[in-house]
A protein has these predicted regions:
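Interfacial/capping segments of alpha-helical transmembrane domains
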Residues: 26-47, 164-176
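Cytosolic-side transmembrane-helix boundaries in multi-pass membrane proteins
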Residues: 1-18, 26, 235, 242-249, ...
Length: 365
């Protein structure tokens, strides 16, 4: 039986964790001689009161939705997929190969092909450590971490030695054909008469693919027989095996779905924004996905809201670095505080609340 009401665990605990993180961040900003109120005002104005700010925030949000959902699926099977960075890198390679070597007549077909390529490559890359866990007993955390480094090497090899145009000094693939370029929010807004909206912002049509992924994962986890088996294995391995769930099958499937979602992040960054394959395009989104999944309690709605928050922090941090004396490193610290309190230290918030609700139940008895 749950000690706390569900709404307390889903809403109150994350909000209190955010408040503690914001309080410590305010103290740090004060310590370097800046005003926390001014900093917050700049973040809000630069992100929420300008359409371009919204465009950048939703661009980052798209990445975090994909990686947050990926980690959530693995969490439901009691697996810790810390290899999102590597799976996204390999997914980017899949996007590049599909866009460069398949003659697509229109972006509507190209995004389907790129999504399938990204998902397939990410799925395969996640399937390797999943097999080692399911069949050989290797710890999924260790293997996925190591596969991040291997993926980085694979990406460098393909970008520098295979896909880079002859004579180019830029470590990047050739530009994708124009028929594969995804419409940005600025393109969409201009069609309905708002030419100046989302100016120069990289947010693109892949945001709606991420929203569709939220709906699909919700249905998978809570409305399908496969989702029931994933949750059963995550809740109790022995009980799930007794009920007929095959752990090897579920571990493989859950991790491959997780890898596919991480790989699909590349349609936003590689096909949608840079329109070519570059190094370091993931920008840590695979690791941020862990915090997004933790804060969102591994539910697609929570993941979406947490991804929005981290998108706000990323774009707001860029505004602070531009308009204040707050160094970029301090902005990373502020983001780390949010991750720390919503993830690792959430028990510090949850424990007093559990004691409070336990005392209420005892009083009722």
């Amino acid at each position: 039986m749950d000690i706390m009401p569900k709404w307390v665990d889903i809403i109150v605990v994350p909000l209190l964790s955010l408040f503690l993180a914001a309080f410590l961040a305010a103290l740090l900003i004060l310590a370097i001689g800046e005003s926390p109120v001014t900093a917050l005002k700049l973040m809000i104005e630069g992100t929420l009161l300008r359409s371009a700010g919204w465009g950048y925030m939703l661009y980052y949000t798209t990445n975090f939705i994909f990686t947050g959902l990926a980690v959530s699926v693995a969490f439901h099977a009691a697996l810790f997929n810390i290899g999102g960075e590597g799976q996204a890198m390999i997914g980017g390679l899949g996007v590049a190969l599909v866009c460069l070597f398949v003659p697509w007549p229109h972006w509507t077909l190209a995004i389907i092909g790129a999504s399938l390529g990204a998902a397939l490559f990410g799925m395969i890359w996640a399937g390797l450590p999943a097999y080692l866990q399911a069949k050989k007993g290797s710890h999924i955390v260790i293997t996925t971490i190591m596969f991040n480094f291997i993926a980085a090497g694979v990406l460098i090899f393909f970008v520098v030695d295979v896909l880079k145009p002859a004579g180019s000094m830029d470590p990047a693939s050739a530009n994708f054909p124009a028929s594969t370029h995804l419409p940005t929010f600025q393109d969409i807004a201009s069609l309905i008469g708002f030419e100046n909206a989302f100016r120069s912002a990289p947010a693109n049509i892949s945001f709606f693919v991420a929203l569709f992924a939220c709906i699909a994962i919700w249905y998978l986890i809570w409305r399908s027989p496969l989702g029931y088996e994933i949750r059963a294995l995550g809740k109790s391995g022995p009980a799930a095996r007794y009920a007929g769930v095959r752990p090897v099958k579920i571990i493989m499937i859950a991790m491959m779905i997780s890898g596919a979602l991480c790989g699909m992040m590349a349609i936003n960054t590689t096909q949608g924004e840079s329109e070519r394959l570059i190094l370091n395009f993931t920008e840590g989104a695979g690791f941020i996905g862990i915090a997004v999944a933790l804060m969102g309690r591994s539910h697609p709605v929570g993941v979406f809201l947490a991804a929005l928050l981290f998108g706000f922090l990323y774009q707001g941090g860029a505004e602070l670095a531009l308009w204040t004396k707050i160094p970029r490193e301090m902005i990373v610290v502020i983001q780390a505080l949010v991750i720390l309190f919503t993830g690792a230290l959430s028990l510090m918030v949850r424990a007093p609340l559990e004691r409070f609700f336990m005392s209420i139940k005892r009083a009722d008895v």
